[in-house]
């Protein structure tokens, strides 16, 4: 598979709204595979397709449990609050404190076109919200209560 260069701010593609995937085909599966490889190579926990220059509604997430691939993901419900630090592969060197829902109900398709409906809490909920925000052209720095430069 291929490892893509992650697009960073101020690239306009990060501010656009991603388009729904209409058909799951070999090209979509290849993009998911490349997103996975890119996320792991960058030592990230999540990646959205716009971050590699593809304005489609696809994300990959792995917080150390299992790889989760979602096509056309949606957050159906949010509960509670959690305030925590976030960073982003597309906003290198910046960390911010962001208030997110503690629990989310998410719907999307897996790579086989099967619909997934599941609840996520804590870190997984935070990462899913962060990645789905990317599909709307929203970056964590837009929601951050405060930000700081992190020395690399």
Swiss-Prot record:
The keyword Protein biosynthesis applies. Its cofactor is Fe(2+). Transmembrane segments: none annotated. It comes from the Bacteria. The keyword Disulfide bond does not apply. GO terms for molecular function: metal ion binding; peptide deformylase activity. Pfam families: Pep_deformylase (PF01327). Gene3D superfamilies: Peptide deformylase. Keywords: Hydrolase, Iron, Metal-binding, Protein biosynthesis. It is an enzyme of class 3 (hydrolase). It catalyses: N-terminal N-formyl-L-methionyl-[peptide] + H2O = N-terminal L-methionyl-[peptide] + formate. PANTHER family: PEPTIDE DEFORMYLASE. Belongs to the polypeptide deformylase family. Removes the formyl group from the N-terminal Met of newly synthesized proteins. Requires at least a dipeptide for an efficient rate of reaction. N-terminal L-methionine is a prerequisite for activity but the enzyme has broad specificity at other positions. This is Peptide deformylase.
């Amino acid at each position: 598979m291929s490892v893509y260069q992650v697009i960073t701010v101020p690239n306009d593609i990060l501010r656009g709204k991603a388009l729904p995937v209409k058909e799951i085909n070999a090209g979509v599966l290849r993009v998911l595979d490349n997103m996975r490889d890119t996320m792991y190579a960058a030592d990230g926990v999540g990646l959205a397709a716009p971050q590699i220059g593809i304005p489609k509604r696809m994300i990959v997430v792995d917080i150390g449990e299992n790889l989760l691939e979602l096509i056309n993901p949606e957050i159906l419900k949010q509960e509670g609050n959690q305030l925590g630090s976030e960073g982003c592969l597309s906003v290198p060197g910046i960390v911010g404190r962001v208030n997110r829902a503690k629990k989310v109900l998410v719907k999307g398709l897996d790579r086989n076109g099967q619909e997934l409906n599941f609840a996520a809490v804590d870190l997984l909920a935070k990462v899913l919200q962060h990645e789905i925000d990317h599909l709307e052209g929203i970056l964590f720095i837009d929601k951050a209560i405060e930000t700081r430069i992190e020395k690399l």
